[in-house]
């Protein structure tokens, strides 16, 4: 009897944590764009990039946090721009559901060292299965291709 009560209490406590706490939709390291690889509707960045570190987390309530460090070009054909963000002055995070952009953040600055952090809330459809988070470039004032993502195509 005591074992059954203990098991019931443990299950109730776990259910309470799952319902009352913030549930994670996705928590992942990020990988840099290798060059010509679109992810769903988001085109590739056009050049190879590298990333010292990156992580993204999306919670069920839409809370989104993305942080990258050392996101810079990794393409010798870019000459002196290699190892820099080369004109990419900002990034926006997009949440893809089934390959389509379901939500996108405002642009935040990308430092000359390739560092950026986004903390915001987005509205993602409740039926979004296996979301992918991509970090998109702002170059010459326009949002373009992806530079880093939580999964590769």
Which sequence ranges carry the predicted segments?
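Short coil-to-beta strand junction motifs in C2/discoidin
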Residues: 79-91
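Helix-rich interaction surfaces within compact, conserved domain-sized segments
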Residues: 100-153
């Amino acid at each position: 009897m005591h074992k059954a009560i203990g098991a019931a209490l443990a299950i109730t406590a776990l259910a309470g944590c799952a319902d009352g706490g913030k549930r994670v939709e996705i928590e992942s390291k990020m990988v840099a764009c290798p060059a010509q690889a679109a992810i769903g509707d988001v085109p590739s960045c056009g050049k190879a990039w590298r990333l010292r570190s990156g992580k993204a987390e999306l919670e069920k309530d839409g809370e989104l946090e993305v942080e990258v460090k050392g996101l810079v070009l990794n393409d010798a054909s870019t000459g002196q721009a290699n190892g820099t963000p080369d004109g990419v002055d900002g990034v926006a995070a997009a949440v893809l559901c089934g390959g389509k952009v379901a939500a996108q953040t405002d642009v935040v600055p990308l430092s000359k060292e390739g560092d950026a952090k986004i903390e915001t809330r987005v509205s993602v459809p409740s039926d979004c299965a296996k979301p992918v988070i991509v970090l998109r470039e702002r170059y010459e004032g326009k949002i373009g291709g992806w530079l880093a993502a939580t999964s590769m195509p």
